[in-house]
Regions:
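Flexible, low-complexity linker and terminal segments
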Residues: 2-9, 133-244, 249-250
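Thiamine diphosphate
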Residues: 1-136, 141, 162-165, 178, ...
Length: 252
């Protein structure tokens, strides 16, 4: 293990490599661009890295590899998820084989975007889990957990850092080397991968049952914490707002 001083986007990239990443595809846009660039910068034997022509194409490239059992990462900014929403909605019903994490970096403010849209609404809309880190350190660990949850429940997972997480710097402890996951390859199965209405109908019930199980699983997730005790005040917060709420609570 070694220490690396990296920005949040770098922590996300290194966490994905530590998780056994096989492929990353994305489309550039602040605040997400450095994630793919960091993967390309570090030694990445067995990892395919590509800038796609748009976010929709990146989503489809990653999904195709995931069907083979590969661990895949998609990167984009929040407005890019609008472009990628068509394959995402169907993908939520088809499911995946290898872990697939979709990083959609939100930009509250906005600082460098046309909108302040909230990626978490997409997660609720298409019925998939979402991870929401509040620091680069959390992002490094959470992205690894996201791959595990994705494979466990055979679903794509959304990962939603914000600008202040993406561009903050922190010292994190990382592995000395990474090894891409070994995977089986694509197995033809028309009853699994061809999304006809009959399959969608059956999968809808499966998704609702699965999400109850995921909710129970998330209830014990180590990153969901309760700090302090007493009845003076309660702050419920996520992402970067957690840090601001924590700072405010120190003044009470």
């Amino acid at each position: 293990m070694r220490k690396e001083y990296v920005m949040g986007n770098g922590a996300i990239a290194l966490g994905a490599l530590a998780a056994g990443l096989n492929l990353v595809a994305g489309y550039p846009g602040t605040p997400s661009s450095e994630i793919l660039e960091t993967v390309a910068k570090y030694p990445h034997d067995g990892v395919h890295v590509e800038w796609s022509v748009n976010e929709k194409a990146a989503m489809e490239v990653a999904a195709s590899a995931s069907y083979s059992g590969a661990r895949t990462l998609v990167t984009m900014k929040q407005v890019g998820l609008n472009v990628a929403s068509d394959p995402l909605m169907s993908l939520a019903y088809v499911g995946i084989k290898g872990g697939m994490v979709i990083v959609s970096a939100d930009d509250p403010g906005p600082i460098s975007s046309q909108t302040e849209q909230d990626t978490r609404m997409f997660a609720d809309f298409c019925r998939i889990p979402v991870f929401d880190p509040s620091t680069p350190e959390e992002a490094y660990q959470m992205i690894q957990d996201a791959f595990d949850y994705s494979e466990k429940y055979k679903t794509p997972v959304l990962f939603r850092p914000t600008t202040r997480v993406c561009h903050a710097y922190a010292s994190i402890e990382v592995k000395d080397e990474w090894k891409a996951k070994e995977y089986e390859g694509f197995v033809k199965d028309s009853k699994k991968w061809v999304i006809f209405p009959r399959l969608s109908f059956a999968n809808h019930a499966m998704i609702e049952k699965r999400n109850v199980e995921i909710g129970d699983d998330f209830g014990d997730y180590s990153m969901n914490t309760v700090e302090g005790s007493g009845s003076k005040a309660v702050f419920a917060s996520v992402s970067y707002t957690h840090l601001r709420a924590h700072e405010t609570s120190q003044d009470l």
